[in-house]
C-alpha cells in the first residue's frame, strides 16, 4: 500500500517546504524506498509556462514536456528522481479538467461544486501519481500557507485522503517559522501555535512539525510547542539555517526524521537506515572547495535569483567535480555595449548565455558572445544563447550584417533562426512550444561528443519554438562551424561548436535540467573544465 505524506506550510511563505520535502524524500530513497514527489500550486494559471520569470522564477521542464514549478527542480536534484505531469498540479489544471467534464456531460446534470467535484479531482491527481509510479511513498507539497483562500480546496482534499486510504497510510507534516527577536534575545513560539490552530480548524492534525529557525531551539520551547499543538515532542524537527543545501538531509537524519516517519506509517524499508555516506562526501566537498572560477552569466532576468536557479545549480555541480567554487557574475543583457564589454569580462573565466524569450537584451547577448569568441573565452549557450551565437557568427564571420532571429525581426532577409514549421499557425502562447525529452545524435570527433563520454545519442529536455534555419547550414560549415548534435532525422540542429576554440558550444536544449549534484551534466562538466583549467577530482 502506498503511503502518503502531505507537507504544508504556515506563518510565512518561502520557508523552504520544497527543500524540506526533498530532504525527507532523499532519506527515504536512500533507505531503499521508491519515492515520488508532487507539488500542488494554488494559482489559477494552467501552468507557469506563460508567467513572468520575475513573478514566478524559472519554469522547469520534465521529461514528458510538462512546464512546471521550479520546486520540481529541487525534487529532481536533491532526491535524484524524475518527475512528470503528475508531479505538478495547479488550481487552473484542476478547474479546467472539471469544467471539461461538465461540458461533456460527465456529471449527468449535477450542480458542479468545490466539494465534491474539485476536491475529488485533486484526490484523483494524488492517486494517479501513485498508480503510475508504483511508489512506496508519495510526498505532496501544498503551495502557499495554511489559511490562504487559494489553498482551501487542496487542504480539504488532503483532509479527506486520511479517511479514504486509511489513517495508517497518511501523514501530515507542517512547516512553520520560529522567529528570533534580536532586541529581546528570544525565540517566539506563538506564530507556530497559531499556524497549527489554523490547520486544526480545517480538520487536519499535524503528525510532525518542521520548525525553521535561525539557531537551535531550546528543549523547553519544543515542550511548549508540543503542549499547544498536540504533536509529540520527539516528532518536532528543527530546520536550522545552514551554509549548504546539502546539510539539511544530514540534519534531518541526525534527528531521526526518516525513522520517525517510517515508524508512524508502519513503513518497512529495505535498508534499516539511509546510506548517506556519498552525500556526506558531497557536503564536505561543497564546503571546502580549494579553487574559484568566475563565470559571467548574461541574461534577461538576472535581478531575480530564482530565474536561472537550475543553471546556477548546474554550474556549482560541475564545480564540485573540479574542486572549484563557481562565482557567478550576473549581467543584465540590456546593459552590455561594445564600449563596456571588455570591462565586464575582464575577470571572467567563462561566459554562459541561458534561455529566454522576447527581443529585449538580444544585442547585448550577441555582443558578449562575439567578445568570448574573439578572445577565446570558454562559452556555453543554452536555447536562446545558442540562437544568438548563431546570429553572431552569421553577422561577424559570414558577413551577413542584417542576420537575426525571426523572433526579433520577422522581416529580416537573413533569418538565421526561424520559427518551427509546425508552430507557424499557433495562435496561443501557452503549451505550444517544443517541450520535453528528445534525442540528439552526436558527431564523432567533436568536443560535444567528448563531453558526453563518446555517446552516439543523448536525450535532453527542450523548451523552444524557434530553430536554426537549415538554409544556412552549408555556409556555416564552410566558415568553420560544426553542427555537433542534430536530431536523428538530421532536420533539427541541436548543438553547434567551433572546434578551434578552447570551448565554444551552444545547445538548443536545456542541459541544466538533467544536472545532479553527484552527476554534473556533460556540457556543464566540460565547460567548467575548460573555464577552470583544472583536472577533475572525483570524490564519490
Swiss-Prot record:
Catalyzes the ATP-dependent amination of UTP to CTP with either L-glutamine or ammonia as the source of nitrogen. Regulates intracellular CTP levels through interactions with the four ribonucleotide triphosphates. It catalyses: UTP + L-glutamine + ATP + H2O = CTP + L-glutamate + ADP + phosphate + 2 H(+); L-glutamine + H2O = L-glutamate + NH4(+); UTP + NH4(+) + ATP = CTP + ADP + phosphate + 2 H(+). UTP binds at residues 13, 188-193, 224. CTPSs have evolved a hybrid strategy for distinguishing between UTP and CTP. The overlapping regions of the product feedback inhibitory and substrate sites recognize a common feature in both compounds, the triphosphate moiety. To differentiate isosteric substrate and product pyrimidine rings, an additional pocket far from the expected kinase/ligase catalytic site, specifically recognizes the cytosine and ribose portions of the product inhibitor. Allosterically activated by GTP, when glutamine is the substrate; GTP has no effect on the reaction when ammonia is the substrate. The allosteric effector GTP functions by stabilizing the protein conformation that binds the tetrahedral intermediate(s) formed during glutamine hydrolysis. Inhibited by the product CTP, via allosteric rather than competitive inhibition. ATP binds at residues 14-19, 71. Homotetramer. It comes from the Bacteria. Residues 1-267 are annotated as: Amidoligase domain. Pfam families: CTP_synth_N, GATase. Pathway: Pyrimidine metabolism; CTP biosynthesis via de novo pathway; CTP from UDP: step 2/2. The active site is at 383 (nucleophile), 510, 512. GO terms for cellular component: cytosol. This is CTP synthase. It is an enzyme of class 6 (ligase). Belongs to the CTP synthase family. Keywords: ATP-binding, Glutamine amidotransferase, Ligase, Magnesium, Metal-binding, Nucleotide-binding, Pyrimidine biosynthesis. The lineage of its organism: Bacteria, Bacillati, Bacillota, Bacilli, Lactobacillales. GO terms for biological process: 'de novo' CTP biosynthetic process; pyrimidine nucleobase biosynthetic process. CTP binds at residues 13, 148-150, 188-193, 224. Signal peptide: none annotated. Residues 294-537 form the Glutamine amidotransferase type-1 domain. Its EC number is 6.3.4.2. Mg(2+) binds at residues 71, 141. One of its GO terms (molecular function) is ATP binding.
Amino acid at each position: 500500500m502506498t503511503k502518503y505524506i502531505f507537507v504544508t506550510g504556515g506563518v510565512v511563505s518561502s520557508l523552504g517546504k520544497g527543500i524540506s520535502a526533498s530532504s525527507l524524500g532523499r532519506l527515504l530513497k536512500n533507505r531503499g524506498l521508491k519515492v515520488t514527489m508532487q507539488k500542488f500550486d494554488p494559482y489559477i494559471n494552467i501552468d507557469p509556462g506563460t508567467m513572468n520569470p520575475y513573478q514566478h522564477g524559472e519554469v522547469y521542464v520534465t521529461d514528458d514536456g510538462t512546464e512546471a514549478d521550479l520546486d520540481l527542480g529541487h525534487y529532481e536534484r536533491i532526491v535524484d528522481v524524475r518527475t512528470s505531469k503528475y508531479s505538478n498540479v495547479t488550481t487552473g489544471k484542476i478547474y479546467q479538467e472539471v469544467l471539461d467534464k461538465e461540458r461533456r456531460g460527465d456529471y449527468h446534470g449535477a450542480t458542479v461544486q468545490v466539494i465534491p467535484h474539485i476536491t475529488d479531482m485533486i484526490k484523483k491527481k494524488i492517486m494517479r501519481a501513485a498508480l503510475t509510479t508504483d511508489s512506496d511513498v508519495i510526498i505532496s507539497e501544498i503551495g502557499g500557507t495554511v489559511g490562504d483562500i487559494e489553498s482551501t480546496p487542496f487542504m480539504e482534499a488532503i483532509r479527506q485522503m486520511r479517511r479514504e486510504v486509511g489513517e495508517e497510510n497518511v501523514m501530515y507534516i507542517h512547516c512553520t517559522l520560529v522567529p528570533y527577536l534580536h532586541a529581546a534575545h528570544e525565540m517566539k513560539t506563538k506564530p507556530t501555535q497559531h499556524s497549527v490552530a489554523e490547520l486544526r480548524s480545517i480538520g487536519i492534525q499535524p503528525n510532525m512539525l518542521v520548525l525553521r529557525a535561525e539557531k537551535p531551539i531550546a528543549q523547553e520551547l519544543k515542550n511548549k510547542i508540543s503542549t499547544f499543538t498536540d504533536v509529540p515532542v520527539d516528532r518536532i524537527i528543527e530546520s536550522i539555517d545552514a551554509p549548504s543545501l546539502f546539510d539539511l538531509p544530514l540534519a534531518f537524519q541526525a534527528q531521526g526524521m526518516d525513522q520517525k516517519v517510517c515508524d508512524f506509517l508502519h513503513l518497512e524499508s529495505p535498508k534499516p537506515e539511509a546510506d548517506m555516506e556519498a552525500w556526506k562526501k558531497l557536503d564536505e566537498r561543497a564546503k571546502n572547495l580549494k579553487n574559484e572560477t568566475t563565470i559571467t552569466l548574461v541574461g534577461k532576468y538576472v535581478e531575480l535569483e530564482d530565474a536561472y536557479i537550475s543553471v546556477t545549480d548546474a554550474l556549482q555541480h560541475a564545480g564540485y567535480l573540479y574542486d572549484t567554487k563557481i562565482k557567478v557574475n550576473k549581467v543584465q543583457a540590456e546593459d552590455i555595449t561594445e564600449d563596456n564589454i571588455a570591462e565586464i569580462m575582464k575577470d571572467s573565466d567563462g561566459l554562459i548565455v541561458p534561455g529566454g524569450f522576447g527581443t529585449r537584451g538580444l544585442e547585448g547577448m550577441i555582443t558578449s558572445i562575439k567578445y568570448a569568441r574573439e578572445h577565446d573565452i570558454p562559452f556555453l549557450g543554452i536555447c536562446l544563447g545558442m540562437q544568438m551565437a548563431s546570429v553572431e557568427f552569421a553577422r561577424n564571420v559570414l558577413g551577413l550584417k542584417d542576420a537575426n532571429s525571426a523572433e526579433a525581426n520577422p522581416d529580416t532577409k537573413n533569418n538565421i533562426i526561424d520559427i518551427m514549421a509546425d508552430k507557424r499557425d499557433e495562435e496561443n502562447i501557452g503549451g505550444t512550444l517544443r517541450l520535453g525529452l528528445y534525442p540528439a545524435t552526436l558527431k564523432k570527433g567533436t568536443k560535444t561528443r567528448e563531453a558526453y563520454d563518446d555517446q552516439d545519442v543523448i536525450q535532453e529536455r527542450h523548451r523552444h519554438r524557434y530553430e536554426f534555419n537549415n538554409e544556412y547550414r552549408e555556409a556555416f560549415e564552410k566558415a568553420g562551424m560544426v553542427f555537433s548534435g542534430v536530431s536523428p532525422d538530421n532536420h533539427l540542429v541541436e548543438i553547434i561548436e567551433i572546434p578551434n576554440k578552447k570551448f565554444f558550444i551552444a545547445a538548443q536544449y536545456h542541459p541544466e535540467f538533467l544536472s545532479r549534484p553527484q552527476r554534473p551534466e556533460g556540457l556543464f562538466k566540460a565547460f567548467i573544465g575548460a573555464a577552470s583549467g583544472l583536472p577533475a577530482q572525483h570524490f564519490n
